[in-house]
Amino acid sequence: MKFLDQAKIFVKSGDGGNGCVAFRREKNIEFGGPDGGHGGRGADVIVEAVPNLNTLIDFRYQQHFKAARGRDGSGDNRTGKSGEATIIKVPVGTQIFEDDRKTLIADLSRPGQRVRLAKGGDGGFGNAHYKSSTNQAPRRADPGWPGQEIWVWLRLKLIADAGLIGLPNAGKSTLLAAVTRARPKIADYPFTTLHPNLGVVHQDAREFIIADIPGLIEGAHEGAGLGTRFLGHVERCAVLLHMIDATQDDVAGAWRTVRAELKGHGQGLDEKSEIVGLSKIDALPPEDIAAKIAELSEACGAPVMAFSAISGKGLADVLRVMATHVDEARALRHARGEAEGDASDEAMRDVTGIDHGYNRPSAVVDWEDAPFDDDDDDDGDESGDKGQWTR
């Protein structure tokens, strides 16, 4: 399956159904009066995060989503059927942006989260609504209110616990294939990996997800190489394994290059927990490995873990350290979730507060049912008779 991590789609909620002009006609009832029903409400457009998807490829073939309109009202005061909501399913980790690609509408980071992108229009009033003491046979009915339409961008940021970063050919895909059942493309040339890959690691009765992203080069945050577009997929990671190829001459320079790109990308990536790893140690003699570890440790100011994804040497230690970071991050998220509560995640969120027919001027209630207004303005009839209040 092809990987696609961003897509632009058009959504339109359903229009409301039209109100009905009808009159009661039965035997021995000469003047039955109006009984036209209201139109049904248009369908909403809802986006839902589901756990069994990991790409936005489906939106390459369908970009327009239009919800059903409400059914028209009919006689005997029958309200039209409301439209059934259109559910757009997206992978967990999908962010929704406005057409400018900068304004975030929603971030669906948990399975089952929903957001209503477009609210269906109200149905129009039937003529029974307009019956009054002075107009007992109204022939007026309202059309349904139009739904909302909007263009949005979907951007997928994969949900992973740990991320693999480094220059091209640092051995990231080889490591992913060695510790998981993922089978990424592996070859001895730069930019073999063209899109992110995920795998599940099982280590000491624990499991976590790691993400392998395409390699970074100098100037990537300015668009060089494949750019930093794919760095978004490790923004949610608890820890980053920064892999440096032991066979290159300047291991300290390689570390500085990637760190500069992380800082240039922003989003706090340069502040994440980092494990510095020297890979491909099976290709060099022990004395060379020791010298490169010392050079790299001096540059980064932290311990360096040496390993080989081919021979497996040192790999278990790296995975244990990664698992420890992941466990700590999960415990922190769990404690934070208990403190804040998850009720807001379970409820469906509305994107906009735009009305689609609610509180319209034609909706009237009796004075007796209306909120009392005690200011000095003449808001209505002062005669004391039962009047009408427009909201």
UniProtKB/Swiss-Prot annotation:
Sorted UniProt keywords: Cytoplasm, GTP-binding, Hydrolase, Magnesium, Metal-binding, Nucleotide-binding
Chain ranges passing through the membrane: none
Cellular compartments per GO CC: cytoplasm
UniProt cross-references to InterPro entries, sorted A to Z: G_OBG, GTP-bd, GTP-bd_Obg/CgtA, GTP1-OBG_CS, GTP1_OBG_dom, GTP1_OBG_dom_sf, OBG_GTPase, P-loop_NTPase
Every Obg domain range: 1-159
EC code: 3.6.5.-
Residue sites binding Mg(2+) per the record: 173, 193
Region (Disordered): 352-391
Places the protein is found: Cytoplasm
Residues annotated as domain OBG-type G: 160-327
Highest taxon listed in the record's lineage: Bacteria
Compositional bias annotation for Acidic residues: 366-382
Molecular functions (GO terms): GTP binding; GTPase activity; magnesium ion binding
Names of the cofactor(s): Mg(2+)
GO biological process, one term: ribosome biogenesis
Pfam families in alphabetical order: GTP1_OBG, MMR_HSR1
PANTHER family tied to this protein: DEVELOPMENTALLY REGULATED GTP-BINDING PROTEIN-RELATED, MITOCHONDRIAL RIBOSOME-ASSOCIATED GTPASE 2
Subunit relationships: Monomer.
Role this protein plays: An essential GTPase which binds GTP, GDP and possibly (p)ppGpp with moderate affinity, with high nucleotide exchange rates and a fairly low GTP hydrolysis rate. Plays a role in control of the cell cycle, stress response, ribosome biogenesis and in those bacteria that undergo differentiation, in morphogenesis control.
Assigned protein family: Belongs to the TRAFAC class OBG-HflX-like GTPase superfamily. OBG GTPase family.
Protein name (Swiss-Prot/TrEMBL): GTPase Obg
Protein source organism: Rhodospirillum rubrum (strain ATCC 11170 / ATH 1.1.1 / DSM 467 / LMG 4362 / NCIMB 8255 / S1)
